[in-house]
Amino acid sequence: MKSSGIAGDSNGFETNFLNETTNREEDGAFNWNAADDGTNERREDIHVRFQDSALPLGIDENELDEIDINGDSKKLDSVEVDESHDVNSPSDSRLKSSFKSVLELTANSMVSVLTPSTKTEQTSKGKGKKKKAHVSFLEGPVEEIPLDDIEPTSPREASPVFNGRPPIPPEFLKSRHKEFTIPNPLQFISNFLSNLFSRDTRYLKSSHGRIIIINPYDDSSQIDERTGKPYMQNSIVSSRYNKYNFVPLQIIAQFSKTANCYFLLIAIMQMIPGWSTTGTYTTIIPLLIFISIAILREGFDNYRRYRQDRVENRIQTQVLRHVDVDPPIVEEHSSFFRRRRWRRSRSQESASRSTIRSTDEREPERTSEDPPQLPPSPSSPSSPALSVKPNIDPQPPLYNSTLTTTRSIPANKPTFFWASCDRKDVRVGDIIRLTSDQTLPADVIALSSPNPNGAIYIETAALDGETSLKTRLVNSTLRSLCKDINDLIRLSGTCTVEDPNGDLYNFNGSMKLDSIQGEIPLSNNDVLYRGSNLRNTSELFALVIFTGEESKIRMNAVRNVSVKAPSMQKVTNRIVIFIFALVVSMAIYCTAAYFVWQKKVERKLWYLTNSKLSFVPILVSFIILYNTMVPISLYVSMEIIRVFQTFLVQSDIDLYYPENDTRCEVRSSSILEELGQVTHVFSDKTGTLTDNIMLFRNLSVGGFAWQHVGAENPKLVSTSQKSDDLDGEAKPPQLENIQGTTIQLLQYVHDNPHTTFSKRVRIFLLNLAICHTCLPSFDEENQIYKYQSISPDELALVHAAQQLGYIVIDRDIDSLTIRLHYPLDPHSHPIAKTYRILNIIEFTSKRKCMSVIVRMPNGRICLFCKGADSAIIKRLRLSNLAKRKDKSVTKAEQARKSIEIDKAIIRNSQSTSRPSLTASRPSLSRRRNDYINNVTSWLDERREKMGVVRPRASTSILETRRRPAVGRHSLAGGERLMEDKKYLSKQEEAEGSIYESLNHNDAKLFENTFEHVHAFATDGLRTLMYAHRFIDESEYQSWKLVNDAALNSLSNRQQLLDEAADLIEKDLEFAGATAIEDKLQVGVPESINSLFRAGIKFWMLTGDKKETAINIGHSCGVIKEYSTVVVMGSLDGVEGSDETVSGGQRLSLDRPPTNDPASLMIHQLISCMNAIHSNSLAHLVIVIDGSTLADIENDPELFLLFINTAVEADSVICCRSSPMQKALMVQKVRNTLEKAVTLAIGDGANDIAMIQEAHVGIGIAGREGLQAARSSDFSIGRFKFLIKLLFCHGRWSYVRLSKYILGTFYKEQFFFLMQAIMQPFVGYTGQSLYESWGLTCFNTLFSSLCVIGLGIFEKDLSASTVIAVPELYQKGINNEAFNWRVYFGWCSIAFIQAFLVFYVTYSLFGMKELNDNNIFAYGQLIFTAAIFIMNFKLVFIEMQYINIISIIVLVLTSLAWFLFNIFISEHYPDKNLYLARSQFLHHFGKNPSWWLTMLFVMVCALTIDIVAQMLRRTLRPTDTDIFVEMENDAFVRSRFEQESGEFLQANAPSVDEIEQYLKSRD
């Protein structure tokens, strides 16, 4: 009798239980969606389809029930059958059969339909649970539907992953996820508190979507039916903590450090009376101080983020507001009673107006207790009153009210105006006004635009990373109803939109206005998202629908960002646990030894009476005695070191970008050492790798290639990897086809205007000028034409046409005017021609081309077409010939590159074990000269293995620029005609015949052009082909009827349009090709190459299209000549077609049994894994787009297979990815590879989620603003700065922190082991060897400064060395500086030195000096020797970079120790166990034996350390040891400085300096 949200229909029905909405479909279905509370990742959907025309259910709409899925009780809307219904009727069987249609479950699923009185069931087997979703009826037998009888479907019809996918071999499904690890209870509590104090309500579902009341007269806050409260404010919050959760989360974070928990336990034991031998509060007070310092530092970082948010939230926005008078200012001469009467009248009118609500029955009614709503303040959405003097727009009021005539007398109608208010005060339902170049403050529905056809131009770089302009068209109905403010104030109705979500590409909604009949449908074209920039639109009126954290850009940001902890902290915590276990073990041993000693010795000593101790006090006393083996200042000193390291990073001049005055900013100093251990870099493309500046580089026309002179010098601007490779053996021969510059081309066309070649050139240039959608505008100030386009490619092409004499000067809906002139002659007379635009066939990803049909000035109709090579070739008149030539050119190109593949495989196989200079060597010093002599060849060899060739030291930089190639084709084909690039001026007559001959040889023309296109693509350029066709009038009119019918179709419109386009885009004449460079930032290819050499894997995650991403991959070196590029889900990608694999190695793969995309992807991934394991791939790059990734996510096994393959690949390119998909990729790599350290770098707001998800987040402060920079851990000005940040500061920080931690553990264990060694001499009574005041100052005055100096100033290698040799970065990746082996090495030295110092001192001084052999003199001798041994070791043995500050610190520490001895000698109490008073000054301090013993012990201990270091460096030298030696040679240093000059502009020597040095050396 009851069901939630089900509506019957004679043709079927559909209901969505999760959304509680009713939607009709022809086939009849209802969706049952079960989602876990609190999560948005897992969702179970059951589609039940009724094919019968009659509905056999009696239904009501108000009850919720429960259902058991996976053993969890979930609250769901359920279906109940009418008790009177006959379950045995025929309709019941039809009902049961219809339940067999099921959609996706998140794992291997089985659905059972249970009739009434049957309880829910659950089955699970092993890891993969077989889930059963149950629907209960009131009575009847049980029917179970096996999985084989179910027809799986997907909510997305395009989802490929559930239809007959083949089984995946289990060896490829070995999950490396850390899903079986025991969860950290502190992390669990942290997550709980985070969710408790900052509950996220954005994902709650409403029953009918969000209903927004449109009523400009009502300024009251609208109510969100999901929460019963006003809609979320428009303020944003990027800070990690709030005032409620900061203290508890920080306490948890601090005590997640094992050392802090250890000292808390010690402090508790110390405060128990009678247990401590060192005092009561000596641990708890320092512990609280150190923890408070750490919490305050984190709080300061969080406060800085809060202030940045406040700046963002206070940006001014114009909102439509009203007041009772205009403005509500009372005249000064008004009487007191008159002003009072005016206020009372205004209050009553506001109260009555606030009760006006929409008559929609779904709007919640206001209760009688609700206070009356008054006109709002522009500064606060919750404030009911408008300020007395509102900030009114300076323009005159657009609504002329009679109220303005009498300012002091209230009237019936309010005055509307545009009030400037803070962005945070914009509310849902507000109507806002925006002007050009403003940033949208919230997600809005566009209402009106003054541009023709209601066009709106926006830049969405902050959302998807694309800086190209996008066009939105305002709905024509809305545009007619919202022309000005007079129309806006009359606007009344409701707007229903979907609930807040993060989908940037789909939107559904509708608007119902009182002034018109029916509803206005709303789509993604009608909505503008927060963060977008309004361009070329003078004014925009818009309705706010989503605000603050519910806006799309914030929905795609990571919420409740967890505190990032460095990887080294895990190892440090484990070592602390080990030391604690060691302390407990030593305490237990000493306690047991004490009872043995008590039984055998103490009982016989008559002078020891009443001295027996129990087990617990003696055990605790030993634990407290040894507890400082873990220094209490460990983590606080690390914070001090990080503060100084932060200063060094931020003051680095090499990381300063002067163009926008940006320096490197460190926002999370706690993870500085993570920069030295990065294994994966995830990078955005637009604005991060590129400048998003398209540069027209080359064109090919008539079978000859030309370099555009508008492009800058290739060496200076080219970001292609090939810019430095042309002199290497891998030089593509096709680049030699470049004949000259476009200036020479124009000169030839001008001098020979009537030749066939010239005519071909002119029609090609006309194609450039016509086939686009750019809008021209004239800049009066600079007297030039500027263009706006949604595509930067088109912008570059139109600019090129302008430079070549075809200037687009005007454009409207149906015409295009071009001014023709000869650019080489400033006195030429331009001619303007107007072309009537008949049709524009827009570009689609399926067609991969666009066409413009125009009527020429002479009346003829011509179609101009441009697109990808694959799209144009099949549309040509000579398509068969073109396909054959394209295939032959491709085959020849692949044959050439197969040689490079074989060489790369050989290089990779030779370097499998990472050949370095660390092979076994009998003597480092003996072979040092060999290394120095071969350093140049070694560096060249490492570059060659990465496919990079760079100039030698003695080569002038000017000589290494790309040399212009010359032509090599003749009439016979294949022979080189010219050796000089300037042959046009010398052999015009011969060349003219050459050009004309090729225009009559179609086969040769195609062959040459395709060679050019391959060469351009290999060079990383974006290529397009052009074609045209003249059309008869009758043919065009016939086609126009078909095209118009497709345009007016209400169903399958795009398909019909594509079919119509195919009818006219045929039999085209080939015109030529162009090559555009998406200009990379300076140094990007070199930076990415350095990352590869360092062993770092590079993933490019971009929102751009696939072709663009692949082209950029070629340009920046992610895709190499010998790379195998696998495009997921693309059959062409499997075959290695030119479209997706530009000359790369073909992946050997049998055809999948079906064309099912899921089967195809499984075959692709399995083949990749097999090839990787067999080492048959030189370089693997996987390309996947966002839609394919979304489909893969729905199949856990396929997704696991993809991740396992992707982490093995050399690089991954993810295109068309949303912000959350970027974050998902980072998260999956983190979870899959336990030891991976991920770094994400981006510059836009769409990169924030990825940046916050990675271990290290880096934001680039660039053209897209500071959103990413503010949310990152580090911010830099350019991508190339990443190299020094990682290789220098990251590596140094890792080495410094490693040596600091090791040095701290070393000094504590060395110092306190001698306490344990002394215990047999004092009967294991816990007697301390050292005086208590000295112990108190040991970690603060006498041993901390030198080890902190080591952690601040250490540089094991210079900056030029670590940048010139990126392989040295693997020291951090492999954890070579800080691991258990290195730790035990330091412990061994401490253990040996402790025994040596104690027993040598005991032998030389303790037993022979009868005058001064008391425990104080003996202890001070060992104390003094220990201090000098520790500090000398840390400064002179362990530190490679010894500076004056380290020496000063050592001297100050030594002086502090002797001053301390002088102080206690004068002021120490007389009555004490330690006879310290006057001892140092008057007794053992004057004894030469005391000083000589100390010096002898120091020399012995340090000698052991030096000998151990020499043996290690001789027998097992590391890369660092070798390059430390090499740096001692001036030539090697100069060579390294030259190699690193690209990244060290402040210190790089010039080529002349290098050459001068080499001459002086000779």
UniProtKB/Swiss-Prot annotation:
EC number of the protein: 7.6.2.1
Catalytic activity: ATP + H2O + phospholipidSide 1 = ADP + phosphate + phospholipidSide 2; a 1,2-diacyl-sn-glycero-3-phosphocholine(out) + ATP + H2O = a 1,2-diacyl-sn-glycero-3-phosphocholine(in) + ADP + phosphate + H(+); a 1,2-diacyl-sn-glycero-3-phosphoethanolamine(out) + ATP + H2O = a 1,2-diacyl-sn-glycero-3-phosphoethanolamine(in) + ADP + phosphate + H(+)
Composition-biased stretches (Acidic residues): 60-69
Coiled coil: none
Segments for region (Disordered): 1-38, 55-94, 115-134, 146-166, 347-406
Family: Belongs to the cation transport ATPase (P-type) (TC 3.A.3) family. Type IV subfamily.
Protein name, entry field: Phospholipid-transporting ATPase dnf1
Species annotation: Schizosaccharomyces pombe (strain 972 / ATCC 24843)
